[in-house]
Amino acid sequence: MRFIPLLAVVAATVIAAWLPQPLNAQSDDVFAFIPAGGRTLLASVVASHPPADEIKALASGKHTRDEWVSYLKDHAKTIPALQSLTDKELLTLADYLSFNMPLPANEMPADAAKLPMDGRDFALEKCEGCHVITVVVTQSRPKEHWLGTMHKPSHIGIKLTEAQREQLASYLVLNAGIPIDQVPEELRAGGASY
């Protein structure tokens, strides 16, 4: 009878090792060279404890990326965490918000890991599953080219909605094109591309 509880503990340990890492673990992983996605940026903004009405406005707003950029810049005094974002991070956050807001029930989840996935998440979950992530993140391509690749027969079977494909392509336009010397040696693909 001891065998079954021991087997359960071993199985739970193996399963836990395969579960997604928490948002704050991104800075500790081998993929830290890949810029933060909007989910991580939004989680850090929320974790800075801005006024409740500002959080509600973020969760319930529906804007284009450019409108979100203006909104975020206009609210940087009341949401101080926005002041520490680079222009690229602000644009990445605005892009994420344009795809994912308003949230259901117009409320920010208490657990930031329950926020919708961002482009970085999709790249690591969907692209890395078939080839080294370097193939993706070292390429600088326009959105139409990313979408063209995602609609090829070799990629169309990837389980992403059309909106998620758009979001992934948009994230890559903003954040890919990482110089190869910034990629850890063990992840270099030797110049591979699509």
Predicted region positions:
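The canonical Cys-X-X-Cys-His
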Residues: 45-53, 93, 123-134, 168
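Electrostatic cytochrome c docking/interface patches
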Residues: 25-46, 52-61, 77-82, 87-89, ...
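Short microdomains enriched in Cys/His and/or Lys/Arg
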Residues: 69-75, 147-160
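Sec/Tat signal peptide C-region and signal peptidase I cleavage site
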Residues: 19-25
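Bacterial N-terminal signal peptides that target proteins for export
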Residues: 1-9
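Bacterial N-terminal signal peptides
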Residues: 8-18
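Short cysteine/histidine-rich zinc-coordinating motifs and their immediately flanking basic loops
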Residues: 60-61, 139-145
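C-terminal capping alpha-helices of c-type cytochrome domains
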Residues: 83-106, 161-194
